Amino acid sequence: MHRQEYRIDVSANPSIATFIKHMCKKHLVIPRLNVGVVMINTTTAINEEWLTSIESLPTHKIFYDYVYDIIAMQCNFCIHLKKTQKENDSYISLADIDYYIIKPEEVIKLDPIKELKETLLHSFSEYRATNTKTIELAAFSSGTKINDELVNRLSFLDTELFNREYKNVKIIHSQNYETYFPFSIIAPEGNISIFMEKYTWFNSSVYFKSMLSYLKEVISDQIAEFNITKLDMEKDTPTSSAYDPKSNIVFVNDITTMCIINFFGCECQLGTYHKFNISSINTKTFHKAVNKTISEIYKAIN
């Protein structure tokens, strides 16, 4: 078996565990391949079926060497599939696809992963020499800006054909940044459990440690920018987290504020008001506890 499930368990303060869980789900996400263009299709599957299956590809187990750059949005990626059925072909697998990292300065083609031959993408109908089946498509990670400069850099594309088909479908492409979460995490009562998968063709420990390194960086920035708006709640009704210095009433309406003030003794939930003096908050102490827990997760990786 090329795939193995495993889990990491770490105990922490419940507020710290909740904060880390939400930060993972917010920041450790992989963009979907939702910008797809079918150039040629004579298979039994319609274009929409091809694009739906491509959008859901588990790209984290393919672009693993670039996971830090991907989640930090420092690069994009794309795939290109061009396959014509031959007499002995009965299916298309993920190994039939070419995979590319797109950086501002270069386009990098990934080395083939032979184990992907075991992951089926499409089954051909019975081979007939007079009616061969062909599929050619390209798909880009969500957020990729498709323009002439990029298309001209992608030497594997027939520029004229791609531009013609892209013009026909670009209006239906989502403008939202669409992502998926490549593992599962729960944190009931401070007990963090992370459920992941290992694959034989890459070092899962290095991969996940790269993700945690980025998580520590983005959390550091977020805590450094943490601030609770002060206002007079007798005059104004807050919509975001806020604090009334006169009454020592805090309104909690975001995850970071909730976790920080809970860490320092408040017992609150989102969308609630509480009597609490925020002078007891020390974000450096909170940040230190977060980093300690992430380091424990890091050490538990094997």
UniProtKB/Swiss-Prot annotation:
It is found in: Virion. This is DNA-directed RNA polymerase 35 kDa subunit. One of its GO terms (biological process) is viral transcription. Belongs to the poxviridae DNA-directed RNA polymerase 35 kDa subunit family. Its EC number is 2.7.7.6. The DNA-dependent RNA polymerase used for intermediate and late genes expression consists of eight subunits 147 kDa, 133 kDa, 35 kDa, 30 kDa, 22 kDa, 19 kDa, 18 kDa and 7 kDa totalling more than 500 kDa in mass. The same holoenzyme, with the addition of the transcription-specificity factor RAP94, is used for early gene expression. Its main location: virion. It comes from the Viruses. GO terms for cellular component: DNA-directed RNA polymerase complex; virion component. The gene is RPO35. It comes from Fowlpox virus (strain NVSL) (FPV). Keywords: DNA-directed RNA polymerase, Nucleotidyltransferase, Transcription, Transferase, Virion. GO terms for molecular function: DNA binding; DNA-directed RNA polymerase activity. The keyword Transcription applies. Pfam families: Pox_RNA_pol_35. Part of the DNA-dependent RNA polymerase which catalyzes the transcription of viral DNA into RNA using the four ribonucleoside triphosphates as substrates. Responsible for the transcription of early, intermediate and late genes. DNA-dependent RNA polymerase associates with the early transcription factor (ETF) thereby allowing the early genes transcription. Late transcription, and probably also intermediate transcription, require newly synthesized RNA polymerase. It catalyses: RNA(n) + a ribonucleoside 5'-triphosphate = RNA(n+1) + diphosphate.
